[in-house]
């Protein structure tokens, strides 16, 4: 009997091995046409299932260790990712940004790698998420507080905005290994009275804080896709995103800056909170744009790739 918890244990590699064993049992006992593995944790299981069943393997790259580590790659993780890609019959990536990484950093042939952009789940009752009246404007960062997400650039941009106006508050919602460092940085910049750290949020809390925000910012250093700006725009919150994000490839009505350009980021925040016409335009056009980005269309692309792989191209 294999012990498989289905969550991240202290020994993650052991859990990956257990999952691989479970996949081998399923590959022996089930009838199927294709194997679809999502990210490096499941690549060994997918490869093993392919070896046992002889069925083609498609892997789905949602992120690589280059994204998570800012280039300080874990050699064990890289080796697992590389083997999964080498053994796969086809590779799906969530953006052209990720596709280039797979081709350039993992040596994969371009014809073997396709892009299928993510989408966002439609809200059943979007009107229930309302923006509250308040004197100060609210600017929000929501996500893991880790180096991949660029939280320090958000803090520095906030300091620049608050040097020009005091009618703005900033929220850094989430948790991560850089949280204490960000709390210290906020104190060093003298903006603690305008900065809030509400902690990790999930589910309805996320929609509520985004709907109540005047600006959402995703200053990621390397973001394979980034669904959170779509979630923000869906509830009418204008978004500022980094050029170094996959969602920048499909969003026309979000402001884009380089993650390191805190002056451009601060200027964009200031413009949105100070010019009602700009806020209104980004709010309305962004919401309309995101409502037309559908999982159904992504599913059609996945199905076409399945057909190509099963039929041997």
Language model regions located:
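Carbohydrate-associated surface elements
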Residues: 97, 119
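Aromatic "clamp/platform" in nucleotide-sugar-dependent glycosyltransferases that forms part
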Residues: 221
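Nucleotide-activated donor-binding/catalytic signature segment of Leloir-type glycosyltransferases, i.e.
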Residues: 181-201
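Conserved acidic donor-binding segment of nucleotide-sugar-dependent glycosyltransferases
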Residues: 254-263, 271-276
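Short alpha-helical donor nucleotide-sugar binding micro-motif in glycosyltransferases
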Residues: 200-201, 208-213
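Short hydrophobic beta-strand element within catalytic cores of glycosyltransferases
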Residues: 238-241
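A conserved catalytic-core segment of Leloir-type glycosyltransferases
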Residues: 1-29
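Conserved donor-binding/catalytic core segment of Leloir-type glycosyltransferases
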Residues: 132-158, 283
């Amino acid at each position: 009997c294999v012990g498989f918890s289905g969550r991240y244990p202290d020994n993650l590699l052991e859990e990956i091995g257990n999952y691989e064993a479970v996949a081998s049992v399923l590959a022996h006992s089930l009838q199927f046409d294709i194997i679809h593995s999502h990210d490096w944790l499941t690549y060994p299981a997918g490869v093993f299932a392919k070896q046992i069943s002889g069925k083609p393997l498609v892997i789905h790259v949602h992120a690589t260790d280059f994204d998570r580590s800012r280039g300080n790659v874990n050699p064990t993780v890289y080796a697992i990712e590389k083997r999964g890609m080498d053994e796969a019959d086809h590779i799906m990536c969530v953006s052209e940004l990720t596709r280039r990484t797979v081709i350039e950093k993992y040596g994969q042939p371009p014809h073997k790698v396709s892009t299928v952009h993510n989408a966002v789940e439609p809200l059943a009752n979007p009107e229930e998420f309302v923006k509250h009246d308040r004197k100060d404007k609210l600017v929000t960062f929501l996500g893991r507080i880790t180096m991949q997400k660029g939280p320090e650039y958000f803090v520095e941009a906030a300091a620049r905005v608050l040097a020009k106006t005091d009618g703005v508050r900033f929220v850094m919602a989430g948790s991560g290994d850089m949280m204490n460092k960000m709390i210290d940085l906020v104190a060093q910049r003298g903006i603690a009275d305008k900065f809030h750290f509400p902690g990790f949020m999930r589910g309805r809390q996320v929609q509520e804080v985004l709907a109540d925000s005047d600006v959402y910012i995703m200053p990621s250093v390397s973001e394979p896709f980034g669904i959170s700006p779509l979630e923000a725009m869906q509830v009418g919150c204008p978004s500022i995103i980094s050029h170094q994000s996959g969602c920048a490839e499909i969003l026309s009505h979000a402001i884009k800056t380089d993650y390191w350009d805190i002056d451009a980021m601060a200027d964009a925040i200031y413009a949105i909170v100070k010019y009602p016409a700009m806020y209104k335009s980004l709010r309305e056009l962004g919401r309309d744009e995101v409502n037309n980005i559908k999982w159904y269309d992504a599913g059609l692309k996945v199905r076409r790739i399945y057909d190509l792989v099963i039929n041997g191209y």
